[in-house]
């Protein structure tokens, strides 16, 4: 299964030219947030691959106008062709803007707890999809780009094979890795775009579930 992860910065290769060519062979698109609605909608015209997304902290406009043809998996456990995905968008709260997706550590921890039963129902998760990184795991030094400590707890409890996030642009720090590992989890910073491949999930799990607030 070939997956395209995108976040924060629209890719010129996808947005301006060669879109169909760059999406050829892509089975699934994961958006980690902070991308214009029209960008995601544009991509739907050139691929049959589902586009799953969580909200970034700057996606306040999504409250009034969610991107058409895409699937919101925020606050959800979504299973696609056997791949179990937990979605948690937003960033740490760093100002008082009410139209943005910002959360305190306590608020995010509460969101995580609400997903426990859904994750248990499908036997765990394979991929954690978020906007922010985990605390101390390639997050930023400033308040706005600090990661969530509860994401470390998620990685410890569920041990997903993949953790895909955005928020911390790679050009913020030359030492930030695009890909690293934490235990048995491959951690991917999806800033702009990144393509990776995973084995096809267990065919016994190839059923489609939609839980929580996920919607199309």
Named regions from a protein language model:
Residues 1-46, 116-124:
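N-terminal active-site segment of His-dependent metallophosphoesterases
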Residues 5-14, 55-146, 213-215:
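Conserved catalytic scaffold of divalent metal-dependent phosphoesterases
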Residues 5-7, 28-34, 52-57, 73, ...:
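Active-site neighborhood of phospho(di)ester-bond hydrolases with catalytic His/Asp-centered motifs
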Residues 6, 15, 64, 77-81, ...:
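Binuclear metal-dependent phosphoesterase catalytic core
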Residues 10-14, 35-41, 57-63, 93-97, ...:
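Active-site environment of divalent metal-dependent phosphoester hydrolases
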Residues 14-20, 37-41, 71-73, 113-117, ...:
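A generic local structural motif
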Residues 27-29, 48-53, 66-76, 182-188, ...:
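Active-site regions of enzymes building and remodeling cell-envelope glycoconjugates
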Residues 47-58, 148-151:
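A short, gly/pro- and small-residue-rich
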């Amino acid at each position: 299964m070939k997956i395209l992860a995108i976040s924060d910065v629209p890719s010129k290769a996808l947005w301006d030219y060669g879109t169909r060519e760059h999406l050829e062979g892509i089975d699934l698109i994961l958006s980690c947030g902070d991308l214009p609605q029209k960008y995601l909608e544009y991509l739907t015209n050139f691929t049959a691959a589902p586009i799953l997304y969580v909200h970034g902290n700057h996606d306040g406009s999504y409250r009034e106008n969610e991107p058409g043809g895409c699937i919101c998996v925020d606050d959800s456990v979504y299973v696609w062709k056997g791949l179990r995905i937990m979605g948690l968008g937003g960033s740490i709260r760093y100002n008082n803007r009410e139209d943005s997706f910002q959360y305190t550590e306590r608020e995010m921890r509460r969101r995580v707890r609400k997903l426990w039963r859904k994750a248990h129902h499908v036997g765990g998760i394979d991929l954690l999809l978020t906007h922010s990184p985990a605390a101390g795991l390639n997050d930023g030094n400033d308040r706005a780009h600090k990661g969530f400590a509860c994401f470390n707890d998620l990685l410890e409890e569920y041990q997903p094979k993949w953790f895909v996030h955005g928020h911390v642009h790679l050009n913020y720090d030359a030492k930030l890795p695009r890909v690293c590992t934490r235990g048995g989890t491959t951690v991917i910073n999806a800033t702009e775009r990144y393509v990776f491949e995973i084995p096809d999930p267990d065919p016994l799990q190839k059923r489609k579930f939609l839980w929580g607030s996920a919607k199309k």
